[in-house]
Amino acid sequence: MMKIKITKSTILLIISFLFILAIMAYIGLDKIIKVLINTNPEYVILAFILQILVSVILSARWKFIIKILGYSANFKNIFLLVLMGLFINNITPSMRGGGEAFRAYYLSKLEEIPKGLAFSTVVVERVLDTAIFLFFTLFVIGYFVVTGFKYLEYLILSWIFLFSLTAIIIYLIANKGLLIKTVTKISKFICKYCSYNYDETKILQSIEEFYNSMKFFKNKRGWEVVVAIFLSVMRYIFDILKLWLLFLSLSYVVSVICVSAVYLITLLSGVLSITPSGFGTADTVMILSFSAFNIPPSVAAAVTLLDRLVSYILPTILGYIAMLIIKREIDKKKGK
């Protein structure tokens, strides 16, 4: 008989799914279905196009950052790597946090870019995204401090956690000796339990490449930083517009400010989530947050389900296909 391996992530995913079903049942499945039946598919398609455009923007930003370092990378490969990164983010605990290392690793394989340099590009991306996100969410938290929100303490805790994590990473980068000690200890631990060969020379070489590229970033001109920030902000704007379009698909008019606030709250709530892509936690917070803005629970639940389709299910499928293509390309390179 074939044995089925059940992981902790699978169990958590099932529990989260059942929890969402319970919330849907409490709101009224018949009410939610009634709202979904009247969905305008044209707006959903537009939302999906925006989702693809977000990936294009992320790819353009990454290519720009790589170009700053004096390297050239094929846009198709970068786009596939971004899709693969989204796939990995969607199947790992918390939100938007698991795919960067894989993207950097496969970038070095596909484009023959030094590993340390490849990792520095995704670190710069992460710092940009996190800084902009923390800045925006600080205003949202301030708004809810004044107006009141049931889960305000949870949001503040998530913000502090993300800020602290970012500060620790920046502190490690600023202290080369400490970073080397940390990376070597983690590498030894991983190699011990994952049957990888520990090569300290390669690790130290990658760290040196990483620092050389970070120095290069530090000396860049202002306009190049502005372009990178602009593309990062555009990514968030497109994400918010995508969610707003899903309301229009249900013929429900809602302010962009409301959608922006809930979008940021939902991302923030997923920081402390232990389920893949914040599944369950983020959905619950999204429904409750929209309800706090006096949006009918049935509409809030319907939009949440549509958002999962557009922002989670379809990108996960595309990301998996992208990962298969990337692995095939790498196998071809090995065969040459």
Swiss-Prot record:
* Keywords attached to this entry: Cell membrane, Membrane, Transmembrane, Transmembrane helix
GO cellular component terms given for this protein: plasma membrane
Q: Which residues cross the membrane?
A: 9-29, 40-60, 68-88, 127-147, 154-174, 223-243, 245-265, 285-305, 306-326
UniProt keyword Methyltransferase present: no
- What are the subcellular locations of this protein? Cell membrane
Q: How does it sit in the membrane?
A: Multi-pass membrane protein
Provide the primary localization: membrane
Family (UniProt): Belongs to the UPF0104 family.
UniProt name for this protein: UPF0104 membrane protein MJ1595
